């Protein structure tokens, strides 16, 4: 196993029914049965694969693509519990192509983000996917933030981020005329893209290479086939049985899981370690009214607090022309709870009993209260935004979309910040690779992550 590879996960997003280039997505039939979504060229239908990827978000699809391009003779399938691909984290993120400035030097996050950003730009150019390299300013608005800003600049240089420079008030105004600040880091390599479109393109590549995508397949059990080898040829070649909530089965030799918000539960289903546990954090965005979009040209971020993995409330242009403001970071009461009152008793009990959330809350009580306050009172978020663009008023913003971040947490209440691979022991454990924690910048890093996953699969499973 690659020594540095431990912590990693999946990202998901929302499909619209059509892939770029007119590649149609088949919707689930009225019966609710699982079906192939734009089946690959190898089979008209199948229930057996050499490799199965669980999870149809951007990391799962990028990994499936990388594996089939590297091993075209293998049959590879993707299982997705939703009717369409990329329904959750991929489709609810900010759409930023991160440069790699924030992350600890030599960490997987830093290495994969810098590599991944270059690969995403190259891929979008090859496929004709629209993006904007609009840059980013990380702005210090208080004197006490300047030492942290300078340290962040040095970190970016260590990580090999392209084009970084420290700028003063005069240059801040040249790039963002309505933004106030004492000093800023100019990150010209940062961009924006629609990651759903990127994910759909990965799926198109995968299926055109012969891969199959099975949607509406919510995994309920993973176990070894019970038939004896003498009685079942299928049991010999495809010893793992993956069963969904409707009792349908898929068999395979090896499994890679990229299950995002459910990565701990899928690991537990296979008899592997459920830790680190996933704690869902909801992030609510505001949207700048169209007549006020002139106030923001590119991404504007605050100087981050190194105690937390969240980057703070920021200004993010979107490919559709909107300007998103946010997000906050508050506990979600459901793993896919995009609305404030979405609730799951099971999810809440898991969070309270099985994770280190209680310790995290006590360690960061004031931060949590502040985030809850901003979520409840629009004026609190606007007041924070006014530190950067004083002209913004509460009448200039509307409540916007929300996303849920799958944050891994250990039993001591520590946030797991880096990507992690995990496996297991025994008959199933030796045939499975779990892709676990996938915090930002997993979408930016998806192509770099997929290459690492393909390397790990090849080495672990002796392909």
UniProtKB/Swiss-Prot annotation:
Give the protein's cofactors: FAD
Range annotated as the organelle transit peptide: 1-52
Q: Which domain of life is it from?
A: Eukaryota
List GO molecular-function terms, semicolon-separated: 2-hydroxyglutarate dehydrogenase activity
Whether Heme counts among this entry's keywords is no
Q: Which reaction does it catalyse?
A: (S)-2-hydroxyglutarate + A = 2-oxoglutarate + AH2
List the InterPro entries.
FAD-dep_OxRdtase, FAD/NAD-bd_sf
UniProt feature coiled coil, ranges: none
- A Pfam family annotated for this UniProt entry: DAO
Which Gene Ontology cellular-component terms appear in the entry? mitochondrion
Protein name as it appears in the record = L-2-hydroxyglutarate dehydrogenase, mitochondrial
Higher taxonomy: Eukaryota, Metazoa, Chordata, Craniata, Vertebrata
């Amino acid at each position: 196993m690659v020594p540095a590879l431990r912590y990693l996960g999946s990202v998901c997003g929302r499909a619209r029914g059509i892939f770029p280039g007119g590649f149609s997505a088949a919707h689930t039939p009225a019966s609710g049965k699982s079906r192939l979504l734009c089946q690959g060229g190898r089979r008209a239908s199948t229930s057996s694969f050499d490799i199965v990827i669980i999870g149809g978000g951007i990391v799962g699809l990028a990994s499936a693509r990388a594996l089939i391009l590297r091993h075209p003779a293998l049959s590879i399938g993707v299982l997705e519990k939703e009717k369409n691909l990329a329904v959750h984290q991929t489709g609810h993120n900010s759409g930023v192509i991160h440069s790699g400035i924030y992350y600890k030097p030599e960490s997987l996050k830093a290495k994969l983000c810098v590599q991944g950003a270059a690969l995403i730009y190259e891929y979008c150019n090859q496929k004709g996917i629209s993006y904007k390299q609009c840059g980013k300013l990380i702005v210090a608005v208080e004197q006490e933030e300047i030492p942290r800003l300078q340290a962040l600049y040095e970190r970016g240089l260590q990580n090999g981020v392209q084009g970084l420079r420290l700028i003063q008030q005069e240059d801040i105004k040249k790039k963002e005329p309505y933004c106030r600040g004492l000093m800023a880091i100019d990150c010209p390599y940062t961009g924006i893209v629609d990651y759903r479109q990127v994910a759909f393109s990965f799926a198109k590549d995968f299926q055109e290479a012969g891969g199959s995508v099975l949607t509406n397949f919510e995994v309920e059990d993973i176990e070894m086939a019970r038939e004896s080898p003498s009685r079942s040829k299928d049991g010999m070649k495809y010893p793992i049985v993956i069963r969904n909530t409707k009792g349908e089965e898929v068999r395979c030799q090896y499994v890679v899981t990229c299950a995002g918000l459910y990565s701990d539960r899928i690991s537990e289903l296979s008899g592997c370690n459920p830790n680190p546990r996933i704690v869902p954090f909801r992030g609510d965005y505001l949207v700048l009214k169209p007549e006020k979009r002139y106030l923001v040209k590119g991404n504007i971020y605050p100087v981050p607090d190194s105690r937390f993995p969240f980057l703070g409330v920021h200004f993010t242009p979107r490919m559709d022309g909107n300007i998103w403001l946010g997000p906050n970071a508050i506990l979600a009461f459901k793993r896919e709870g995009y609305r404030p009152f979405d609730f799951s008793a099971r999810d809440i009990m898991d969070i309270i009993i099985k994770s280190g959330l209680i310790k995290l809350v006590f360690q960061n009580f004031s931060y949590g209260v502040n985030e809850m306050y901003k979520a409840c009172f629009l004026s609190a978020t606007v007041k924070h935004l006014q530190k950067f663009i004083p002209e913004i008023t509460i009448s200039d913003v509307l409540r916007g979309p929300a996303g849920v971040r799958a944050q891994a947490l250990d039993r001591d209440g520590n946030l797991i910040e880096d990507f992690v691979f995990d496996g297991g022991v025994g008959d199933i454990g030796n045939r499975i690779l779990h892709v676990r924690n996938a915090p930002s910048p997993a979408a930016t890093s998806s192509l770099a992550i997929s290459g690492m996953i393909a390397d790990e699969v090849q080495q672990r499973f002796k392909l």
